[in-house]
């Protein structure tokens, strides 16, 4: 250990060792002390610690690294960190922490800082008094050479103090840290820091290097803090100057020591690098401080350079550069050293090859050279050569990727010397040296270590910096290649290519120089151009093409430069004399061809190019027979297609003639390559005139108008239009067919949505641009679009929304147009609607459009048009309406368009009410969508109109006040039509429209009776002479739910008219229509009429209906009366009289007339059913009604059921009214007596099941069929139980069998198209549901008979195949059926066809396994696909088997309580659901017979096992026969477990009763449950008939099985 001063360690702390660590008396006696990092220290006092902690601390003092690591790990994982808050522990840590923080082993260093993090978290502020003892090693740990240790040290310190508080820490403890690290750096060595008895010398050297490096980096860090702390706001008590003074004092001590400066050339790389960092930082912030020590540094520079290593070279060279930059006068100290000249030092440094990849060594070396200066660095030619030779030698020895850096440094070094040196001899020598390199490079004698492309990049880089070098390169190059003895073809092509590229690159550098005269430019640039032009005519095509491509680059370089006359003349001469022949020789794919355009572009602003260009063109057209000429001519348009030369060169007649002929020859075949045509269009007024482009456009248009175009036509069309853009309106007027182009591109549907659509968009944008400039042109284009689109809409050949969208696009794009420009004119609507109204007048349902009932009171208008024509007109109305609606939704509309739409809406709604495609055979799509969309649109318009208005104002403005606006105008127009004196069909339709729209308004309003009377009074409704107008207004206001005084007055007047003498049906109908309109739809307790007038009214009107209405088939007044009665019932329910009988007669009459397919009849039926339903609910309140209900119950149910079964035959079955009737029928038939159901035959039910698409009707039909089947099965069961001597012969009804046999088709196809085939699949599965219903609550023999029939007809196989497809059982992943019930189903719970079919399928599969288990199991066993059977078993075991097992066990438990088991007291049956086992015990005296039935988990796909447990009183043969008989019922007879138990019980009981068993099967009871009844006449043994039959069949004889005699029946 080195001797050191003691003044640094004077302070003592009670209970603590000194910060210097002067612990032992021995050390004091020797006048030596140890720092707290030394290996020599006094062990800390541990007496106050617990035993476990003492062990840990002592382990930390041991030499063994593993023991230290374990001790530190124990501290890190200490359970109670509060024990660290102990003075003796913290004292001990102050002793151990510095030594552990610099330990040789990195794991120890890492763990000590991890522990410091734990300690910081545990103690926080409590650690503050001890921080001055820990801070130095802690901060030194920041700069540990191991990154993980460094990060751990910083993280642990962050745990104690956040980073924003660190500056205050350095300020407070900086004066403590600096002396210690300085002292450690100067006085510690490997002997003091490492115990060499336990560590190697290398480990000790590494440790001391790491520690000293950390010391220097810590000082660097602290020095940087002095600059950062200048702006730090601190407590006044803390003196910044103290910290700074202490730091400078210790730095001075450090810098004064020779040991510090000796490290400049030290082999300790880490310390040297840290030293350079320290010096650089001090130099940056405080240059004067370094100034006083500069001599110490500079006198060691030569030694430093000679001792640089791979790690130290870059930082030390950077340091030297900075020092020279700051102290330039000091260079002479080492530059003039005769023993160590700089050139020698640096050449040795270069040849040492100490550079690392990407280290920046050569960059730093060049920077150092520039700092030193050329005159100091290379004072003589010899020194230049010495350094150049060193670079070349190193480049040849370096690796390839490093040699590029060496070459680059060499070239930049020469450039630096050439530029910086003032000695002309040295400059000339540099040029000579470079000329030698270039010449050898051209000759291929200069062997490169790196790739040639990398070397070329080096050359380009230095040429960019030094244009003299670029000139030198060209001088050498031209001299080399102009040597007549040199054959260029002998030079490697790659080398030639690179050299020419560098030559052209030098042109760019020459361009950037400011030359004074043209001669000076030509003297430099002329040889280069002449050389390249000469090479471009070389006989070798590769060389010629290479030269041409380089000339192209030259053209690009000078494209933005003003050329001098000699250069222009040189290019023009080359253009005319040499280039055409080169192009013809090399072809249009060569660079020479592109060079033609580039030279023309270069010269276009300097001279008239017409004559030179014509000269060139004539050389190309001199012979059309030569293939080379044709290829060049065909490629010329693509060269000039960019149009840059338009107006710069003139048309050449020979070229125009050629291209006219060529273009139209190509267009004759659409399959040709049309790129040349497109290029010709682009070269307009360069190669071809505008007239040629027009002819191309007109020819292409013909293909478009005939829809016979291909992509080539579109591309050419688009290009032509854009080329002729300036005169487009004039050209369109010249050829009117062009106006048809816009609709074609608007409405075409390109398959290629990208390519073709882009061209369409381009054409549209062009036309739009020109239309905005010319209003006349715009109007003509829009007129064409309007005519085209409206015609296509009417024909149904285009989607209405698409047409509307395109017209809206044109409307918004092509300037100002009237809003109705693209709508159908009023004349169209008048003609179409007028032709359809008479037809629809006979097709309406008055329950849907009540006001249209007035049409019956108007003289019938003859229908003089053909039905097909009516259909066509209606289709036109529909298409026009849908288009108009889409159009006005976007653009808005006026009152006329809305008026026309409303009439169309009425007609289309009637069409829908009749059912889609039930009126006209012409198909109409999206009618429902139109109705919904129009209602939504109309409601939206009403809401807009009503905004910020009260209800009274809204109705006044719509119906009374004369104001503008499309909604008021619309309502006034309908009001005027409906109140006109001359009543026509049109006015009645208008009245219905008024009603519909008033309903929309009324639903959005709230008004009281007073305000309603105000509106009705202003309308003069009570005195109006128009019943249509009165009815339409009152019907429209019904949603307001008010019964005002005026409404009551109108109602009473109508009743008065109907109470007197009634004459014509028309008058009665008018009064009834008004009465209905004046009757509120809400059924309230408030009487509609005074009770005194009700009876007279009912008697009078029912008498008229009975005597005149029904007999004369005047159904309208009867309908109106039944409609009124529905709302009148609460008022008259308590009245009695004969009129109730009449009303029930009308209802029955309506049911009887229901077979007539007429809209008025369907409305009559609906009103009758609705009234009957209301009467049926509360008939107990009125004895007359009750009597009518009871008396007519059976007949009424019969009529209702008959009407129900007729539904599928009605042509109006899809109408809204018919569907409403069906809903009432379903409700009224819920309690239909079984007697009525059984009175109908099966053939009357099944058509309804098969032809109905209504799920509710289908469900009711199934209910009736089950009712009928149940009754018949019960009768059959009773009959065969009485006639027990005969085996039952039961078969399914023929209609059911026919449907089961007539399978609808391929299951795979049907399931894949579920929506299409849903009905067929559903009917088929429902038929099977009915078949399985035969097995419910009947005898086993009857079941067996039906099963045999199914087997005989092979009906089960197609069913199972269908179920496999529906449930996806043939695939690895069957469908998930968890959401579907299995035991029962309700198809109305599901909205999708797929869900309905799957729900029904899983139920049928459940029924199959329940009733036909043996048959299903047999079918699956035939399938040899193991994967399939595994899927089926898995699916069944998860979804069906648990239900079947539970149901079977339930059946057994119920059977135990039945008479069959209770009658035998010795039988005991036990059920164990957990194990799925059934125990059968038969007690015989004190003994018992026991059998067990075990149900598998995949029941019934796996057989139930019947096992004999215990037997007594029977031999083995009989015992096995009973087991086999029970097993047979389960495995092959489709029997249930209950069936097997019953057979087993009877066999045993009859055996012990002495009944003789069959001599073949040894059982008393056969599987058919019959006794042995066939006795042999010889041996007298009895046999079962079935057993005997099987014996005869198998033995092919009729002999007795026992005695072998001929069998004679006894």
UniProtKB/Swiss-Prot annotation:
Which key words are in the record?
Answer: Cytoplasm, Metal-binding, Nucleus, Repeat, Transferase, Ubl conjugation pathway, Zinc, Zinc-finger
This protein is called E3 ubiquitin-protein ligase listerin
Query: PROSITE patterns given for it?
Result: ZF_RING_2
Annotated region described as Disordered, given as residue ranges: 1-20
Q: What is its EC number?
A: 2.3.2.27
Q: How does it assemble?
A: Component of the ribosome quality control complex (RQC), composed of the E3 ubiquitin ligase rkr1/ltn1, rqc1 and mtr1/rqc2, as well as cdc48 and its ubiquitin-binding cofactors. RQC forms a stable complex with 60S ribosomal subunits.
Protein family per UniProt: Belongs to the LTN1 family.
Q: Which residues form a coiled coil?
A: none
Chief place where the protein resides = nucleus
């Amino acid at each position: 250990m080195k001797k050191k001063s003691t003044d640094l360690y004077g302070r003592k702390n009670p209970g603590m060792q000194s910060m210097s660590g002067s612990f032992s008396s021995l050390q004091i006696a020797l006048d030596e002390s140890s720092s707290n990092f030394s290996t020599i220290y006094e062990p800390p006092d541990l007496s106050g610690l617990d035993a476990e902690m003492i062990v840990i601390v002592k382990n930390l003092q041991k030499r063994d690294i593993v023991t230290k690591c374990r001790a530190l790990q124990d501290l890190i994982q200490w359970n109670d960190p509060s024990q660290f808050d102990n003075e003796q522990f913290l004292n001990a840590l102050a002793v151990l922490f510095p030594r552990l923080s610099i330990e040789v082993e990195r794991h120890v260093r890492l763990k000590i800082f991890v522990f410091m993090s734990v300690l910081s978290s545990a103690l926080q502020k409590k650690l503050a008094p001890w921080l001055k003892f820990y801070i130095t090693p802690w901060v030194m740990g920041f700069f540990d050479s191991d990154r993980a240790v460094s990060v751990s040290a910083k993280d642990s310190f962050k745990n104690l103090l956040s980073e924003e508080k660190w500056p205050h820490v350095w300020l407070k403890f900086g004066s403590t840290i600096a002396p210690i690290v300085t002292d450690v750096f100067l006085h510690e060595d490997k002997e003091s820091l490492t115990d060499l008895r336990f560590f190697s010398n290398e480990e000790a050297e590494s440790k001391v290097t790491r520690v000293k490096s950390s010391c220097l980096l810590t000082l660097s860090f602290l020095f940087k803090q002095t600059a950062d702390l200048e702006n730090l706001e601190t407590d006044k008590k803390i003196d910044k100057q103290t910290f700074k003074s202490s730091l400078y004092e210790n730095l001075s001590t450090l810098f004064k020591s020779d040991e510090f400066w000796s490290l400049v050339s030290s082999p300790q790389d880490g310390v040297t690098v840290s030293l350079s960092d320290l010096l650089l930082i001090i130099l940056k912030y405080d240059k004067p401080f370094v100034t006083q020590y500069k001599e110490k540094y500079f006198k060691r520079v030569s030694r430093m350079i000679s001792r640089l290593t791979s790690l130290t070279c870059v930082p030390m060279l950077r340091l030297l550069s900075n020092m020279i930059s700051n102290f330039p006068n000091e260079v002479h100290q080492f530059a003039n050293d005769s023993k160590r000249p700089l050139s020698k030092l640096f050449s040795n440094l270069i040849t040492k090859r100490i550079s690392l990849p990407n280290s920046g060594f050569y960059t730093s070396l060049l920077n150092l050279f520039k700092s030193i200066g050329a005159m100091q660095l290379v004072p003589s030619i010899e020194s230049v050569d010495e350094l150049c030779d060193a670079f070349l030698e190193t480049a040849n020895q370096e690796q390839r990727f490093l040699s590029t850096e060496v070459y680059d440094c060499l070239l930049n070094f020469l450039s630096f010397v050439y530029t910086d040196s003032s000695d002309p001899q040295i400059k000339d020598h540099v040029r000579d040296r470079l000329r030698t390199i270039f010449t050898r490079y051209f000759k291929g004698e200069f062997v490169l270590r790196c790739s040639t492309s990398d070397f070329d990049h080096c050359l380009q880089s230095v040429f960019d910096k030094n244009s003299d070098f670029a000139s030198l390169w060209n001088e050498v190059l031209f001299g080399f290649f102009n040597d007549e003895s040199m054959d260029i073809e002998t030079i490697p092509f790659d080398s030639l290519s690179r050299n020419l590229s560098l030559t052209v690159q030098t042109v760019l550098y020459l361009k950037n120089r400011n030359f004074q005269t043209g001669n000076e430019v030509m003297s430099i640039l002329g040889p280069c151009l002449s050389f390249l032009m000469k090479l471009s005519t070389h006989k070798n095509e590769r060389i010629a093409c290479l030269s041409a491509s380089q000339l192209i680059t030259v053209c690009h370089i000078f494209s933005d430069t003003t050329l001098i006359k000699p250069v222009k003349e040189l290019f023009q001469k080359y253009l005319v004399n040499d280039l055409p022949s080169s192009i013809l020789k090399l072809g249009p794919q060569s660079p020479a061809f592109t060079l033609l355009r580039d030279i023309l572009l270069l010269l276009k602003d300097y001279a008239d190019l017409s004559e030179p260009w014509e000269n060139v063109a004539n050389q190309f057209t001199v012979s059309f027979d030569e293939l080379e000429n044709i290829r060049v001519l065909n490629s010329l348009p693509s060269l000039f297609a960019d149009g840059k030369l338009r107006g710069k060169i003139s048309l050449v007649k020979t070229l125009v003639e050629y291209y006219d002929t060529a273009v139209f020859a190509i267009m004759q075949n659409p399959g040709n390559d049309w790129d040349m045509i497109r290029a010709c269009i682009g070269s307009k007024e360069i190669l071809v005139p505008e007239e040629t482009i027009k002819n191309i456009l007109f020819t292409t248009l013909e293909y478009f108008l005939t829809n016979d175009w291909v992509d080539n036509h579109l591309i050419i069309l688009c290009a032509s239009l854009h080329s002729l853009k300036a005169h487009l309106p004039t050209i369109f007027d010249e050829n009117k067919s062009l106006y048809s182009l816009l609709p074609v591109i608007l409405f075409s549907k390109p398959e290629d949505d990208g390519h073709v659509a882009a061209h369409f968009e381009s054409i549209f944008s062009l036309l739009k641009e020109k239309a905005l400039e010319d209003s006349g042109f715009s109007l003509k284009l829009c007129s064409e679009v309007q005519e085209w689109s409206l015609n296509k809409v009417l024909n149904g050949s285009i989607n209405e929304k698409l047409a509307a969208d395109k017209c809206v696009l044109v409307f918004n794009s092509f300037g100002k147009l009237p809003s109705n420009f693209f709508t159908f004119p009023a004349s169209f609507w008048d003609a179409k609607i007028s032709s359809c109204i008479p037809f629809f007048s006979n097709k309406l349902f008055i329950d849907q459009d009540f006001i249209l009932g007035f049409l019956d009171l108007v003289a019938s208008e003859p229908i003089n048009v053909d039905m097909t024509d009516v259909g066509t007109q209606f289709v036109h109305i529909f298409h026009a309406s849908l288009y108009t609606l889409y159009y006005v939704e976007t653009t808005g509309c006026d009152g006329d368009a809305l008026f026309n739409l409303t009439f169309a809406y009425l007609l289309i709604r009637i069409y829908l009410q009749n059912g889609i495609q039930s009126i006209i055979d012409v198909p109409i799509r999206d009618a429902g969508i139109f109705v919904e969309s129009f209602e939504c649109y109309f409601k939206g318009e009403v809401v807009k109109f009503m905004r910020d208005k009260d209800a009274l104002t809204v109705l006044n403005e719509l119906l009374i006040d004369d104001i503008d606006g499309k909604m008021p105008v619309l309502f006034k127009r309908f009001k005027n039509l409906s109140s006109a004196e001359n009543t026509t069909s049109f006015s009645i339709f208008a009245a219905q429209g008024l009603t519909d729209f008033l309903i929309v308004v009324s639903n959005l309003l709230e008004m009281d009776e007073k305000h309603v009377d105000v509106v009705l009074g202003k309308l003069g409704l009570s005195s109006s002479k128009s019943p249509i107008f009165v009815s339409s207004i009152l019907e429209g206001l019904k949603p307001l739910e008010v019964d005002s005084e005026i409404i009551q007055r109108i109602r009473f007047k109508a009743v008065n008219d109907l109470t007197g003498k009634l004459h014509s049906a028309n008058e009665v109908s008018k009064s009834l229509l008004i009465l209905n309109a004046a009757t509120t739809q809400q059924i309230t307790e408030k009487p509609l009429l005074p009770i005194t007038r009700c009876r007279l009214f009912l008697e009078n009107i029912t008498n008229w209906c009975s005597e005149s209405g029904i007999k004369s088939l005047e159904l309208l007044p009867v309908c109106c009366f039944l409609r009124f009665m529905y709302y009148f019932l609460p008022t008259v329910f308590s009245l009695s009289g004969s009129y109730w009988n009449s009303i029930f007669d009308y209802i029955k009459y309506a049911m009887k007339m229901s077979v007539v397919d007429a809209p008025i009849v369907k409305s009559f039926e609906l009103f009758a059913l609705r009234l009957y339903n209301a009467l049926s609910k509360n008939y107990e309140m009125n004895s007359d009604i009750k009597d009518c209900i009871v008396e007519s119950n059976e007949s009424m149910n019969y009529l209702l059921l008959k009407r129900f079964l007729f539904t599928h035959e009605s042509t109006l079955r899809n109408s809204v009214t018919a569907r409403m009737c069906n809903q009432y029928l379903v409700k009224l038939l819920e309690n239909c007596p079984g007697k009525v159901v059984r009175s109908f035959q099966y053939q009357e039910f099944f058509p309804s099941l098969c032809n109905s698409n209504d799920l509710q009707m289908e469900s009711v039909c199934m209910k009736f069929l089950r009712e009928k089947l149940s009754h018949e099965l019960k009768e059959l069961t009773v009959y065969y139980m009485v006639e027990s001597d005969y085996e039952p012969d039961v078969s399914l009804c023929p209609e059911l069998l026919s449907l089961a046999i007539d399978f609808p088709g391929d299951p795979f196809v049907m399931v894949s198209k579920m929506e299409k085939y849903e009905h067929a699949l559903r009917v088929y599965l429902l038929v099977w549901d009915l078949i399985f219903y035969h097995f419910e609550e009947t005898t086993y023999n009857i079941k067996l008979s039906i099963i045999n029939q199914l087997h005989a007809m092979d009906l089960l196989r197609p069913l199972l195949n269908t179920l496999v497809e529906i449930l996806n059982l043939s695939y690895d992943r069957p469908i998930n059926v968890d959401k579907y019930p299995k035991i029962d189903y309700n198809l109305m719970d599901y909205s999708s066809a797929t869900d309905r079919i799957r729900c029904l399928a899983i139920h049928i599969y459940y029924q199959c396994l329940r009733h036909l288990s043996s048959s299903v199991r047999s079918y699956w066993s035939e399938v040899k696909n193991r994967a399939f059977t595994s899927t089926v078993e898995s699916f069944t075991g998860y979804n069906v088997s648990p239900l079947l097992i539970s149901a079977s066990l339930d059946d057994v438990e119920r059977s135990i309580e039945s008479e069959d088991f209770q009658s035998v007291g010795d039988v005991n049956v036990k059920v164990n659901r957990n194990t799925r086992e059934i125990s059968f015990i038969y007690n015989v005296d004190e003994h018992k017979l026991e059998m067990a039935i075990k149900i598998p988990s995949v029941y019934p796909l796996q057989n139930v096992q019947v096992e004999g447990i215990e037997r007594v009183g029977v031999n083995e043969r009989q015992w096995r026969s009973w087991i086999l008989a029970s097993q047979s019922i389960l495995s092959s007879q489709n029997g249930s477990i209950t069936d097997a138990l019953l057979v087993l019980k009877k066999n045993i009981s009859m055996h012990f009763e002495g009944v003789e068993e069959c001599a073949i099967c040894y059982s008393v009871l056969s599987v058919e449950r019959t006794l042995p009844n066939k006795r042999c006449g010889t041996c007298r043994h009895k046999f079962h008939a079935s057993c005997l039959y099987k014996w005869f069949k198998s033995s092919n004889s009729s002999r007795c099985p026992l005695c072998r005699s001929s069998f004679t029946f006894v």
